[in-house]
Each structure stands twice: as structure tokens, then as C-alpha cells.
């Protein structure tokens, strides 16, 4: 017996290329073999002339906002990330896609002469974070951050027994009244260290950024040239730039002194 949930139906139009870019980023977050069906889905929210796309694997949350879309009816749903990505990929560039939440379990996509029906799951089941990250914020240039990540990620360890080496150690240090954001990684055979000079002192607790987060962040930064807002609280970190937000859990452990 199918359970129905009552939610305002949703109807909107969106540019294919913007949606494809957003869904493409989501592919790196979604776990292909998740035991929870909802984690194979993307959350789609149409509200205030914007479309918000969210993907998570519980350790990593990625959100992208597509602004200035035509919304006939606001609403939200979740649908398979892999299937919607595959469909949008095959739709010609420059097209407009119409979305219509026909009922609580069916999202209809229409573009040119093609029509597709996607299965949906209740958006209220989608796990979201509600932490307040408004402390310890600082800005850093995206190109500089990508540079230090690329210089250090080659030394990340794959040894699962030493989880504290399965990422990049990020910390702020001071030298001759100058402050640097320093990245370090080691697999115990080799070590890579790179640093960025900061404009002023920042409050930033030392963290170990997980490997998956690093790969996702690298792909997001590749086509960016702007300031990124970084803030961390307890066991999580948030990167905010343009219309994208990446929130990640951190590796719990102590990076070796070097």
C-alpha cells in the first residue's frame, strides 16, 4: 500500500545548462551504493524565483542555487540524482526544461519533444544540517586555495588504519608577524606542505579535511576566481562561494607534528 504525503505541487522552468552544471557537481557527493534510498536522491526546492539543488552522503552536503528561474508553483521533492543527471546530460545545450510535480510520487520533465516521468521520495526525509556557522569566518581567494590543495593532496595516505592521515591538515600559523593558512599531508613516506599568506590574523581551529571533501572542493574550485568564505565549528567546516555551499564533517584525530 502506497503512503501519500500532502505537499503543495511544484511547477517551474529552468535553463538546461545551469541545471546540468549543478547536477554534475552533485555526482561527486552522492554515494552510488547507499543503503538509504533518500541518499541516492537530490533535493529540489523551487522558491523565491530560485531553484535550490542539494546532495548529501551524510558526511558531505553540497547545495547550489540557480537564480532567476520561472516558477509557476513553489514546492519541493527529491528524485534520483543519477537518473535526472543522465536525462539532463542528453538534452541539447541551450534548451529550457519544464518541471511539473504531477503528484507526490511523480516528477514530470519536458523539453522540446521529450517527456520523462521520475519517481520521487518525500522531501521531509532528506537529511539537512541546521548548524549555525556564523563564527570564525574568513575569506580566501579560490585560486590560492586550489593551489595549496593541489600541491598537498598527492601525499594523502590511503591507509584506512591511520584515518588521521586520510586527508589534508589545515591550520593557521604565524611567522615574523605574518599569518599563513598552511596545508600538509603525508602517507608517512613522503610529505607535502604548502601555505597561503593571509591578510590578517584569523580565528581558525586546526582541522583534517577528508579526502572525498578535497576532491569535491577541487572540482568546484577549478572554474572559480573569487573569494571563498570559510568557517568551521566543532566537527564541521563550510565553504561558501558564488551560489554554492559545501559543508563537510572533519576527520577526528591528531595530525603528527612535522
Where is each model-derived feature located?
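Structural preference for solvent-exposed beta-strand-turn elements
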Residues: 2-258
Amino acid at each position: 500500500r502506497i503512503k501519500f504525503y500532502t505537499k503543495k505541487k511544484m511547477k517551474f522552468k529552468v535553463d538546461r545548462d545551469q541545471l546540468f552544471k549543478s547536477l554534475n557537481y552533485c555526482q561527486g557527493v552522492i554515494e552510488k551504493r547507499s543503503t538509504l534510498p533518500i541518499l541516492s536522491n537530490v533535493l529540489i526546492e523551487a522558491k523565491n524565483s530560485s531553484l535550490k539543488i542539494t546532495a548529501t552522503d551524510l558526511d558531505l552536503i553540497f547545495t547550489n542555487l540557480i537564480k532567476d528561474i520561472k516558477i509557476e508553483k513553489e514546492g519541493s521533492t527529491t528524485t534520483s540524482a543519477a537518473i535526472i543527471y543522465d536525462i539532463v546530460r542528453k538534452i541539447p545545450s541551450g534548451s529550457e526544461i519544464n518541471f511539473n510535480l504531477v503528484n507526490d510520487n511523480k516528477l514530470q520533465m519536458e523539453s522540446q519533444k521529450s517527456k520523462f516521468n521520475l519517481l520521487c521520495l518525500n522531501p521531509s526525509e532528506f537529511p539537512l544540517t541546521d548548524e549555525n556557522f556564523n563564527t570564525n569566518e574568513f575569506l580566501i581567494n579560490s585560486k590560492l586555495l586550489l593551489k595549496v590543495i593541489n600541491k598537498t593532496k598527492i601525499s594523502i595516505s590511503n591507509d584506512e588504519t591511520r584515518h588521521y592521515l586520510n586527508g589534508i591538515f589545515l591550520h593557521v600559523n604565524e611567522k615574523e608577524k605574518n599569518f599563513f593558512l598552511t596545508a600538509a599531508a603525508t602517507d608517512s613516506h613522503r610529505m607535502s606542505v604548502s601555505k597561503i599568506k593571509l591578510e590578517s590574523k584569523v580565528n581558525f581551529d586546526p582541522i583534517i579535511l577528508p579526502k572525498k571533501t578535497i576532491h569535491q572542493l577541487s572540482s568546484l574550485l577549478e572554474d572559480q576566481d573569487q573569494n571563498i568564505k570559510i568557517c568551521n565549528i566543532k566537527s564541521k567546516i563550510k565553504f561558501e562561494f558564488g551560489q554554492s555551499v559545501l559543508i563537510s564533517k572533519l576527520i577526528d584525530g591528531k595530525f603528527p607534528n612535522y
